[in-house]
Amino acid sequence: MANIIEGKLNAEGFKFGIIVSRFNSFICDRLVEGALDTLVRHGAADGDIDILRVPGAFEIPVAAQKAAASKRYDALICLGAVIRGSTPHFDYVCAEVSKGVASVSLDSGMPVSFGVITTDSIEQAIERAGTKAGNKGTDAAITAIEMVNLFKVI
């Protein structure tokens, strides 16, 4: 039988950086609340969590890159909300943010979870920030916890 290796959901002793956009703060603040609650419930100490605020979602990857290079963190959690408007700007921002965050993770070898919600409406964003569709900040924090534990054993 094959060995199954997976990360545990224990945040104790790890340092986390949460990188969050200020734009659409009424949504992003809920994502941060979900991430913080999840990290603490899984054993992270308040002093082991930093929140790095950036102006918008487009700035998340470069802040994540700098945070990863600092070696201060065991994992990063990227949070933001991009809501479709009437121009193609949405498509460009979404594509670059997702590619940028993935690139930081691959280049640094550090777990970098993606909790940037991309929606067609404010209603959809609200649903994904703690109402009907759960909280994507919570999901991103769980991913970071699991991955940092997996990286510890592989």
From Swiss-Prot:
Q: What is its EC number?
A: 2.5.1.78
Q: Record's InterPro entries?
A: LS, LS/RS, LS/RS_sf
Catalytic activities? (2S)-2-hydroxy-3-oxobutyl phosphate + 5-amino-6-(D-ribitylamino)uracil = 6,7-dimethyl-8-(1-D-ribityl)lumazine + phosphate + 2 H2O + H(+)
UniProt keyword list: Riboflavin biosynthesis, Transferase
Residue sites binding (2S)-2-hydroxy-3-oxobutyl phosphate per the record:
86-87, 128
GO annotation (BP), single: riboflavin biosynthetic process
- Single GO molecular function: 6,7-dimethyl-8-ribityllumazine synthase activity
Keyword Transcription included in the entry's annotation: no
Query: Binding positions for 5-amino-6-(D-ribitylamino)uracil?
Result: 23, 57-59, 81-83, 114
Q: What pathway is this protein said to act in by its record? A: Cofactor biosynthesis; riboflavin biosynthesis; riboflavin from 2-hydroxy-3-oxobutyl phosphate and 5-amino-6-(D-ribitylamino)uracil: step 1/2
Q: Which GO terms describe its cellular component?
A: cytosol; riboflavin synthase complex
Keyword Transferase assigned: yes
UniProt lists the family membership as follows: Belongs to the DMRL synthase family.
PANTHER family per record: 6,7-DIMETHYL-8-RIBITYLLUMAZINE SYNTHASE, 6,7-DIMETHYL-8-RIBITYLLUMAZINE SYNTHASE DMRL SYNTHASE LUMAZINE SYNTHASE
What the entry lists under HAMAP family is as follows: Lumazine_synth
What's the name of the protein? 6,7-dimethyl-8-ribityllumazine synthase
Species for this entry: Syntrophotalea carbinolica (strain DSM 2380 / NBRC 103641 / GraBd1) (Pelobacter carbinolicus)
